[in-house]
Regions:
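A short acidic, often aromatic-flanked loop/helix-cap motif at beta-alpha or helix-coil junctions
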Residues: 105-111, 121-124, 164-166
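Short, glycine/serine-rich, charged loops/turns that create anion-binding
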Residues: 42, 69, 120, 140, ...
């Protein structure tokens, strides 16, 4: 999770431990430097899905925040631990060596902020995106008009699809578009 890959040889095995000697240590720069997902809180199963797929696609920071219409339940310690286990599994799956962070508040980002907006026709995200970037995605029930106005002042209103997407689908498709533009 710190951009290092170690090769090791097992030197001893006991009933409860294995001891290793590191024989090679290599550093790998992250392929994506800053891709932030600011997602209104979701139900736990959907949150886990977004964390798994977002990690595989290159999200560097997850910010799950309260909105007026989002799931207001704060995850338990066990649920947070499960999210970290999901991240580790996703890192192994995609070969990433940099561990994304999780925060439970809105980010203080001010560069390349893209707000997934359903209120009217907007520019498609793939036409205007660049990294570093922050993608703001709403909850299952959407944002209130006050929240929409606030986010429109922060950044660019964009469309992710000509269709109305589920919150987790919007997050994943937006991240995929941003990550693809980083290549």
């Amino acid at each position: 999770g710190l951009n290092y890959l170690a090769e090791a040889v097992i030197t001893e095995i006991t009933s409860s431990n294995a001891f290793v000697e590191i024989v090679n240590l290599s550093f790998q720069n992250p392929k994506i430097t800053s891709l932030i997902l600011a997602q209104a809180k979701l139900k736990q199963a959907n949150l886990e899905y977004v964390v798994q797929k977002g990690t595989e696609l290159g999200v560097t920071h997850f910010h799950f925040f309260k909105s007026k219409l989002s799931c207001q339940k704060t995850p338990s310690k066990n649920q947070i631990l499960r999210l970290h286990c999901i991240i580790i599994s996703a890192l192994k799956q995609c070969g990433r060596l940099d561990m994304p962070t999780i925060s439970w508040e809105f980010p203080n980002s001010n560069k390349n902020i893209f707000f997934a907006d359903l209120s009217q026709k907007k520019v498609m995200l793939n036409k205007c995106s660049m990294l570093p970037a922050t993608l703001i995605v709403g909850p299952e029930k959407g944002f209130t008009s006050e929240e929409i106005q606030r986010f429109q002042k922060l950044g660019h209103s964009v469309s992710l699809s000509p269709h109305i997407l589920r919150a987790e689908t919007a997050a994943i498709s937006g991240i995929a578009i941003l990550a693809n533009n980083a290549l």
